[in-house]
């Protein structure tokens, strides 16, 4: 860590690796959840970028037109880790965390209710069934979803750079059409946490 330079690392990553006055390892990678959205549709509808619960709800109301276009594809498969990641991202964005420095945290009733109501809204704008990362990526890549929450691992696929998961918005598996119509948000804000936050691993 010292050879690479302390200033080349985020403080949070160094804190996680700290042990007995030194570092147990070198933090080498990490990722967060992103709101991936169709910027072309947002621009055409005059919608704000979806960086808050309110902006996402407004976009769902404007763009949800199933089966051609779903406003969102949110994970609903409760035994799939992806749903836990997305739900925790949504919780943290509203200042809700099940843990604190002392262990388990008491959940704030108002903020938690806001989280659950918001999650219900995005689930209601999703296709029916048990959904997880696979369906959200497939629907977005087919041009049938206005928004999803996904990790940065989707970015190379979105650009047509991964043969096993190509965009299907047109007949060219290496097409960058969808990438050119997409933008991402890294920090989401809820009504009880206007500064926003994000889940990270």
Model-derived features: positions:
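Beta->alpha turn/N-cap motifs
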Residues: 133, 150-155, 187-188
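Hinge/lid segment of periplasmic solute-binding proteins
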Residues: 1-32, 83, 174-188, 193-196
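Extracytoplasmic "Venus flytrap"/periplasmic binding protein-like
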Residues: 1-9, 40-51, 146-147, 157, ...
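Short helix-initiation/N-cap motifs at beta->coil->alpha
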Residues: 53-57, 128-141
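Sec-exported extracytoplasmic/periplasmic mature domains
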Residues: 39-40, 47, 61-68, 92-96, ...
